[in-house]
Amino acid sequence: MTTYDLTTFGEAQIRLTVEKGNRLATCQQLRLTPAGSEANVAGLLAQLGRRTAFASSVPQGDLATRFMDEYRGVGVDLSHVVRTPDGRMALYFMEPGEYPLPAKVTYDRMHTKFREITPETFDWDALLDTRVLFVTGITAALTDSTAETVTYAVEEAHRRGVKIALDVNYRSLLWSQERAREVLEPLLDKVSILFCSRLDGIKVLGMAGDGPTVNAELQQKYGLDHVVSTDQVAGVYYSGIQGQQYFTVEPVPVVDRPGAGDSFVGGTLHGYLSDDVLAGIGYGLRTSKLALTHHGDLTHLSPAELELPTSTDIVR
């Protein structure tokens, strides 16, 4: 038996959010919440009873402590996080946006210690004592050394027989489409379950067509066991060893949007860890809706809430 069900690594961040009705350049208050795509996935799975670990490199100080408290508090093993005596935390600022203005993200994550990681930073014997390694394109995008570390982790996990989950999660503010393809495409023959939206499939991997077409072509071209593709509000598509399936997306009121995609990935991986990705997508659709109901990148929930009916009634 492995020590973990899922391990992952990424940059620990702090999100600073402008209150609705204000702009970053003129606001007087900001809401502070810990953030990080990989940590969000590990945190959601930990709340569902999975054994998860997250690795990173963070400085000493209150902001790093705030991050650690958030994810340790929901059960994520943070013993593989490297604490450094100096350095800074990665930040990002968000304006939620109100029509006709879109939401806007401003990154402030240059010169962090995490950007300096190499394959030698982490103890892979410990981190790869797991059923699944989860990696994202966000971490690969930061620097050449983080891309090298993601590549090493995937190759070493594959060599050891560990299943690999990859979320392309393309961010145009972090790297170009060409560089994303250069780094990520060579990893795909080692990946078991791929999360790639229709738009990411088009931009990064050269696909074309509607959601079902892109989803099916990704699975066929790269010979993946499972491909899960979101297409904004149009739906979710699955192709893989469980066949092909389309899932509708139910629009819900939004309190806070960041983290909902990570919550979907985490819910889907909960099913994958039980050998049922289709059931997992159902969980993911549920958890991503719950993510939109409260502030913060990390979705807070209990296992019972996976089955709770969607309602505005009071549960008494």
Show the residue positions of the predicted features.
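Structural alpha-helical scaffold elements that stabilize or flank donor/cofactor-binding regions
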Residues: 125-126, 186-187, 220
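Conserved beta-alpha-beta core of the PfkB/ribokinase-like small-molecule kinase fold
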Residues: 132, 138-216, 235
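Short, conserved phosphate/pyrophosphate- and ester-handling motifs at nucleotide-, phospho-/glycolipid
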Residues: 45, 197, 261
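Glycine-rich phosphate/adenosyl-contacting loop at the front of the ribokinase-like
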Residues: 1-77, 316
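Conserved phosphate-binding/catalytic region of the ribokinase-like
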Residues: 1-7, 155-156, 207-316
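Conserved N-terminal subdomain of the carbohydrate kinase-like
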Residues: 51-137, 309-316
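Structural motif
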Residues: 5-7, 129-132, 193, 226
